[in-house]
A protein has these predicted regions:
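Structural alpha/beta surface segment adjacent to cysteine/selenocysteine redox centers
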Residues: 1-61, 166, 170
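C-terminal cap of thioredoxin/glutaredoxin-like
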Residues: 42, 46-173
Length: 173
């Protein structure tokens, strides 16, 4: 992607975000390693606060230009969504959730994820990039339609399941 193409993509994302009431400030975004932020997302999940923490991190990054690789900033953001400061600090001081984040990274590699956003539905359908709602709706409908199809099975008298369909015919017992 050329610089001009990247600038155009950023402008399109900024316009889409603005249409949804979000402010993206690419001029103030600070780069940095987000590994610790992802570890705090796992802590937040354990407290039932993962969506709030994710939204807070995104706003801090894209709207406020905060350094989310900075541990004191991360602790402050965590407490703003209701996480105990001591627990957030303990995660950052140790290696808690490091394995979970590495597992997430490995799963992302298996999916072929190279950027965000990236949406996966039912573990097998995906779209990359900021997409309009109708694209995401098609993704969800496809995953739902495929997951709601039944595969008949018969249970033998010994309790073992076996496929009840062979070719074009199925048996019922």
């Amino acid at each position: 992607m050329t610089i001009a193409e990247a600038e155009q993509a950023n402008q399109q994302m900024t316009q889409r975000a603005a249409a949804d009431g979000l402010e993206f400030r690419f001029d103030i975004i600070r780069g940095g390693n987000t590994f610790d932020a992802h570890r705090l997302l796992h802590l937040a999940r354990d407290h039932g606060l993962q969506p709030q923490m994710k939204e807070r991190l995104l706003r801090a990054t894209f709207t406020e230009g905060l350094p989310i690789a900075d541990p004191p900033t991360l602790v402050r953001l965590a407490t703003q969504v209701g996480l105990p400061a001591g627990q957030a600090q303990a995660v950052l001081d140790g290696d808690a959730y490091a394995g979970a984040v590495r597992a997430d990274e490995q799963q992302a590699a298996r999916y072929g994820i190279t950027g965000v956003p990236f949406f996966v539905a039912d573990g097998k359908y995906a779209v990359s990039g900021a997409q309009p709602p109708e694209v995401l709706l098609r993704l969800l409908r496809r995953a739902y339609e495929d997951s709601s199809q039944l595969t008949p099975v018969a249970v033998t008298t010994d309790g073992n399941s076996q496929s009840s369909c062979d070719g074009d015919s199925c048996r019922t017992g």
